[in-house]
Amino acid sequence: MKILIVSQHYYPDPFSITTIAEYLVKKGHDVTVLTGKPNYGYYRIVPGYEHLDYEVLNGVKIYRVNVIPRKGTKMSIVKNYLSFWKNAKNKVNKLDDDFDVVYSMSLSPFISISPAIKYAKKHKIKHVLHCLDLWPESVVITGITKYGTLFYNLLLMWSKKIYHSIDRILVSSPSFMEYFKNIIKIKNENICKFVPQPTLETKNNSNDYFEYDKDYLNFVYCGNIGKLQNIPNLIEAIKILTYKMKIRFYIIGLGALKDYLIEKISEYNLENNIIYLGAKPASEARKYFKNADALYLGLKDEGFVGKTIPNKLTFYMQNAKPIIASIGGDAKQVLLESEGAVICDNSVEGIVKAFEQFKELDEPSKEKMSLNNFEYFQKHFDNEIILNKIEEELKKHCI
């Protein structure tokens, strides 16, 4: 197959789309990626990529369009989204006209898949979307608008138009199918199929890991630092826990609440208890997992977005560690089945209780949780299984 992949992010941005493209090349397919110049988490274009419009990396042909870098402000993020939308739509007009199928991955915002829609429509080929985020649901959950407002209704109309133009939708969480049926009104049940997103593949020396002070219980959170991840309640819970146990919490990542996190650490005098490490590549983040007592997962149990299976969950399970999870929805169901987590609700009290419950576990119980998570990952989320499903979907919709 000759495959066109459209995604705003690609290597060195830390997203699993890179894993997918390189897998398809290894399986003998001709793969071209249309993406933006990398800037995620850097507040600028990554050095060396400023003038790099085309490259071939591990067999993948990559076209990079100019984007306005994200700088942390809401306006810069909007400009970043719109610059990719505009420049990528222009670029697809200049691409070869002989691709067999288009594959896109929908992260926020969903307009980033518009170039894929444009190419597929122009050349009358099928478009397969891998949906990792729901619109306009995400806009509501992040507090930008509310259900029923004029802005929401306009976004809903736009979303329906875009989603209905797609030939096949792979959803990263089972509950997303309910959203497409009841909210987006896609009645043909054969259009949607549950296919998790692959775990980001990284190279790491298993003997290269961070040494913790064993006088403390050491926990790690790795991921987006935002409202959806329930960061404010986590901070309040840690503040309470410092009076109950010797605890250190290591946080890796970036997000809208990064500055809020830093301010609260200072305000509550938690410098010895919350260590913010900033953004790190997945390969480096793993170094903090090995000797940690457990990994923390938080996701606000609100709306359909709150029912998702975050990619960090499968990343955690792959690393064979116990998990403390403040979640609901599909992710909660996964962890109930794996029997590898202490699960709680989103409240401060619930989070505190979960950490106290974990503290009382003996070492064999923790080791069993770790093993359970890894075995569940191998059975349900192993990349070879998921990537093969993606390839099969593309073959089915190839002209």
Language-model features, listed with the residues they occupy:
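N-terminal subdomain of nucleotide-sugar transferases
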Residues: 1-58, 239-241
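Conserved donor-binding/catalytic core segment of Leloir-type glycosyltransferases
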Residues: 199, 211-238, 250
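Nucleotide-activated donor-binding/catalytic signature segment of Leloir-type glycosyltransferases, i.e.
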Residues: 216, 252, 259-287
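A charged, aromatic-enriched C-terminal amphipathic alpha-helix characteristic of glycosyltransferases
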Residues: 346, 360-395
